[in-house]
Amino acid sequence: MNDNAFTFQTLHPETIMDALFEQGIRVDSGLTPLNSYENRVYQFQDEDRRRFVVKFYRPERWSVDQIREEHQFALELVKDEVPVAAPLAFNGQTLLAHQGYHYAIFPSVGGRQFEADNIDQMEAVGRYLGRLHQTGRKRPFTFRPDIGLAEYLFEPRQVFEDAALIPSGQKAAFLKATDTLLSAVTECWRTDFATLRLHGDCHAGNILWRDGPLFVDLDDARNGPAIQDLWMLLNGDKAEQRMQLETIIEAYEEISEFDTAEIGLIEPLRAMRLVYYLAWLIRRWGDPAFPKNFPWLTGEDYWQRQTTTFIEQTKILHEPPLQLTPMY
């Protein structure tokens, strides 16, 4: 099965409830879809008024071994008292299967949205990221990939080349801007960082707040540099980002060492995320959920803006990286 062409159109509510019933769970409420385009995620309540979340994985995106590694990492983190949403085990298994779909069941954990401009919350997140990475350093993922240029830049570049949905009037300029950006990232990228298991997609939307942070959604967990789990939390102008990063690092280093040389990877990682995200949208265009929710992707104005974004990011890559105050 080609995951680029796959849709979830055969995942009917009856299929979901049958899968849950196989694990001894009877759904007593409706299935409320949660915000996830890559997978299909639903919240529900059972007959005992317990709340759960069930996640059906997009076939062929991750292998069974890769998903199991994600689950094992989550369970290790819970054991090490890191607040993460970890899957529940049924007959000793966290990864379950039904009618060709793999799925997992999680307890439904409520919470407020993490406030990215709240320094006290940022400090707590930094401390727990230090603990998360302390667990992540124990051993690398064996089956899940490393963050690198091939997956995040060169493969997406080919996707852009082959994409029919990029308007013909914008494609040449966009590809030129892409190539210039790729060259700039390649010049800045370094691989001498210490590799560890990461959350991988640690932005404010994947952190809930319940008297402390709760990390959710390890679906993008990979091996890579520690800074990958820090930079997406930064916002505002450079002065604000500097203060936020210093707050995170100071709290982080109460638990784990942090190599400040990795700060130079922030803008290359940002560029890689920009490129990878666009390629992801194109790859998923065959899933009806994507044209419905991203209708602007075929518009000339959108691709003109992306070209401008790539040009601006290239300029940033040629500037000095974010600098901490001298005490660091």
Curated annotation (Swiss-Prot):
Keyword set, alphabetical order: ATP-binding, Cytoplasm, Kinase, Magnesium, Metal-binding, Nucleotide-binding, Phosphoprotein, Serine/threonine-protein kinase, Stress response, Transferase
Residues annotated as site: ATP: 36
Tagged with keyword Metal-binding: yes
Location of this chain's protein in the cell: Cytoplasm
Disulphide connectivity of cysteines: none
Quaternary state and interactors: Monomer.
Record's function text: A protein kinase that phosphorylates Ser and Thr residues. Probably acts to suppress the effects of stress linked to accumulation of reactive oxygen species. Probably involved in the extracytoplasmic stress response.
Entry-linked NCBIfam families: PRK11768.1
Family statement drawn from the similarity comment of this UniProt entry: Belongs to the SrkA/RdoA protein kinase family.
Protein name, as recorded: Stress response kinase A
GN (gene name): srkA
